[in-house]
A protein has these predicted regions:
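Phosphate-binding loop of NTP-binding sites
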Residues: 1-196
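Generic preference for hydrophobic/aromatic residues in regular secondary structure cores
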Residues: 63, 201-202
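The −1 position to Zn-ligating cysteines in a subset of zinc-ribbon hairpins
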Residues: 193-196, 200, 213
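Short Cys/His-rich "knuckle" micro-motifs
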Residues: 202-208
Length: 213
């Protein structure tokens, strides 16, 4: 990684990409901090991961992260490499890791990386060719997230807050805003039916799409 900086390559992907090509289960063997927080979701994961990083750094913690933006397996591998010595053990100065993780990369990362906490910001339609429907992504996360991880979920998003129902969880939400509406005007709405009782959802207010209360 230092050599890449000297040659003016930022190295956000290449070291980890090479490591995974040489050893597909590289993440199994590389050292990791004792405490790991993962952030995933369709929108806002970079912002949330960076905010957590900044807050914890301001509190005096030494944080290992992939905040340069590469959130697939190669980027996560590079971030962990950055925190390890020559023998692959995590250097003792790192108190924890904040890792932004792409939703579709979950099956390749979570078998080897076991976060204490996983923040899921929301799940939306994104790239149809890659992500299909948000329910499809929710199913990937449900099957991939470590059972021991505590989830921090968006209570205003009925898709992401139902992920991995067997995991321990806490919820966050945002109070009603002046711009919220009582009727949804979006042509697309991926959550019309209650995921528990199958009845039609009645919203007190909506923020956009299926986000609301």
């Amino acid at each position: 990684i230092p050599a890449l900086k000297i040659t003016r390559h930022n190295g956000t992907d290449f070291p980890g990409s090479l490591a995974v090509k040489l050893c597909p289960d590289f993440l199994k063997y590389i050292g990791k901090p004792e405490h790991i927080i993962a952030v995933t979701g369709t929108n806002g994961k970079t912002t949330v991961a960076n905010m957590l990083n900044d807050v914890l750094t301001a509190e005096g913690k030494t944080v290992l992260s992939n905040r340069a933006g590469s959130n697939i397996i190669s980027g996560v591998s590079t971030a962990l490499l950055k925190g390890c010595g020559l023998l692959g053990r995590i250097r003792p100065e790192y108190d924890l890791a904040i890792l932004e993780i792409d939703e579709r990369s979950a099956p390749r990362i979570y078998p080897y990386v076991k976060p204490e906490h996983i923040v899921i910001t929301n799940l939306f339609r994104d790239s149809i060719m890659r992500n299909a429907h948000p329910g499809y992504i929710a199913d990937i996360l449900t099957r991939s997230l470590p059972k021991e991880s505590r989830l921090i979920l968006n209570a205003d998003d009925l898709i992401s807050c139902t992920v991995a129902p067997e995991n321990q969880r806490v919820y966050f939400g945002i109070d009603r805003l002046p711009t919220d509406v009582t009727e949804c005007e979006n042509l697309l709405n991926d959550m019309r039916i209650c995921p528990r009782c199958a009845g039609k959802l009645r919203y007190e207010y909506r923020r956009y799409h299926h986000i609301g209360r």
